[in-house]
Amino acid sequence: MSKAWGGIGIGAWADEAERADEEQAAEATAATADTQSFPSLREAAAATATSGKSRKMKKMSLSEFTTGAYTAPGGRNSVGLTQQEILQLPTGPRQRSEEEMQPGRLGGGFSSYGGRSGGRIGRDRDDSDGSWSGGGGGGGRRPYGGGFDDDRRGNQSRVSDFPQPSRADEVDDWGKEKKPLPSFDQGRQGRYSGDGGGFGGGGSGFGGGGGGGGGGLSRADDVDNWGAGKRQAPVRSSTFGSSFGDSGQEERRRLVLEPRKVESGGSETPPVVEKTSKPNPFGAARPREDVLAEKGLDWKKIDSEIEAKKGSSQTSRPTSAHSSRPSSAQSNRSESSGLNNVVKPRPKVNPFGDAKPREVLLEEQGKDWRKMDLELEHRRVDRPETEEEKMLKEEIEELRKKLEKESVAPEIKESDQEPGSNNNHNDLPEIIRGKEKDLEILTRELDDKVRFRQKPVERPGSGAGRTGTYSERTHSRAGSIDETRSFESTERPRSRGAVDAWVRPANEQRRNFQGTKERGFFSNRSSSREGW
């Protein structure tokens, strides 16, 4: 009777179940062991708190303390080498033959390439570990790095922990067993890429690769002088190793220049400039100096004449009314610039255009700008008109009326006039000018007195004689009393029909000043205003 489970025994599934349970239990114990070896911070703190008191002190030797390796009693098992292994260890360097000691011979690893030191390094590595040579026989391919990669792999195991015999000891001359190179370029390309044999065989680290004896596919063991077989223009390869041997001068093509042609004739013709297809932005135009030189003219003289004309026109034309006459500095400057052939800058444009000063415009209109300015200044001064000013204005008006009447009917006036009165009528314009000057001087003096008068600052003991200072002055001119009165009226504070503080008796003013010596002018004014 055939079994449905394919021949599996009756208790096979039970065995498998038990085996699975055992594996799970082993995994659980491993997990707990890991957690015990690496507990959390809380568990470690709790464990130290509980077991800190019950923990006993342990004795250890000085060697154990210095090395840091403590072994429990009863567990001192020897892990080091046995006595037989210790006796097999080398006591010194291996004895080399005379041929191997010569640096120029092809006996050691890379002895001819890198000198004596390079060969020694290769020999030491071959003697120390057999992993450099690709498994001892050089049969299998290994990645770049040699035996260092074997330590990282867990599947591959070494044959023995003891050092294997080096291929450098087995082979005396690597040059006899090396394979011929296919081409020069391939050997140079594979120096670092690992296909043509730079420092080793194809694919291995520094040791053998591609079979054979010692990975000796390098041209360092074959050719002593690399410059002998060098080509003129080698093909540049895209690999990394080719950039070290190639140079820019080998790849660059040599320029083939035509020989220089020198004509036998005595006169050398100027070189013909090749015309380009790009159009000239100036067309057929040429410099002004070249054109004038072809016509036989001196362009320097022409420029100096033009500059002289410009300077004369600028100096002759007045820029404003104040500078109607040409200044000597400008004329001298224009002459010197014309002589020195210095290009003068363009004349500055007047920002005001054709605008003229106010005085010039008023004179063109027949007005006296001085009288207008005086009248404007007089309006700024706030003072009443004096009697003397009124009288002078009336006299000037009467004289002007007489002058107008004489100009309207001169014949009638001449018939009515007496023979002794001709001089008076002819002198009327001069008399009017004199009166106007007197009026102008008088108004200016009065305005200056009001404008530049000293403000009266009353001091203790001096207020008695201040009231009549302007009235007690002696004036030689008629109407001076009215002038002082008008001046006093301007200085008085304008009140609304109350008693004036400036006309108070001297005793009252003294009383105000003697009240407090600390109070000044403002305190006196405040007390005087109380009666307004």
Swiss-Prot record:
PTM characteristics: Phosphorylated.
UniProt cross-references to InterPro entries, sorted A to Z: EIF-4B_pln
Gly residues composition bias: residue spans: 105-120, 132-147, 193-217
Span list, region Disordered: 16-365, 401-434, 451-532
Source species, domain of life: Eukaryota
Cellular component aspect of the GO annotation: cytosol; nucleus
GO molecular function list: mRNA binding; protein homodimerization activity; translation initiation factor activity
Keywords linked to the UniProt accession: Initiation factor, Nucleus, Phosphoprotein, Protein biosynthesis
Compositional bias per record (Basic and acidic residues), positions renumbered to this chain: 167-180, 249-263, 286-310, 355-365, 401-416, 472-494, 507-520
Disulfide bonds: none
Compositional bias segments (type: Low complexity): 26-35, 237-247, 315-337
Motif mapping: Nuclear localization signal 1: 177-184
Motif (Nuclear localization signal 2): 237-244
Compartments in which it is found: Nucleus
Broad class of the protein's primary localization: nucleus
Function: Promotes the eIF4F and eIF4A RNA-dependent ATP-hydrolysis activity with different efficiency depending on mRNAs, thus providing mRNA discrimination during initiation of translation.
Complexes and interactors: Homodimer. Nonspherical monomer. mRNA-discriminating component of initiation complexes.
UniProt record similarity statement: Belongs to the eIF-4 subunit B family.
Protein name: Eukaryotic translation initiation factor 4B1
